[in-house]
Amino acid sequence: MSTAIWILLLIVALGVGVFGGIFIARKQIEKEIGEHPRLTPEAIREMMSQMGQKPSEAKIQQTYRNIIKQSKAAVSKGKK
């Protein structure tokens, strides 16, 4: 094979590897965030108290469930 074909194959393989790696990394990050959200009830409690609110446990849990529901909806919307 000529040198030009080898260079072309190398560029194509590099492009496929980069795009494949980006796709796989994106899916892994979405899965990780979906399973283990970064925002916890303790963090919500801290944010509400910093804003001057005195949240009840029910309000914290409601906010947490809404955040989880929205993140799952965003992930499922992205899969369509």
Swiss-Prot record:
Q: How does it sit in the membrane?
A: Single-pass membrane protein
Q: Which UniProt keywords apply?
A: Cell membrane, Membrane, Transmembrane, Transmembrane helix
Q: Where are the transmembrane segments?
A: 4-24
Tell me which Pfam families the record gives. UPF0154
Q: Which InterPro entries match?
A: UPF0154 (IPR005359)
Cellular localisation: Cell membrane
Please state the protein's primary subcellular location.
membrane
Signal sequence span per UniProt?
none
Q: A single GO CC term, please?
A: plasma membrane
Name of the molecule in the record: UPF0154 protein SpyM51556
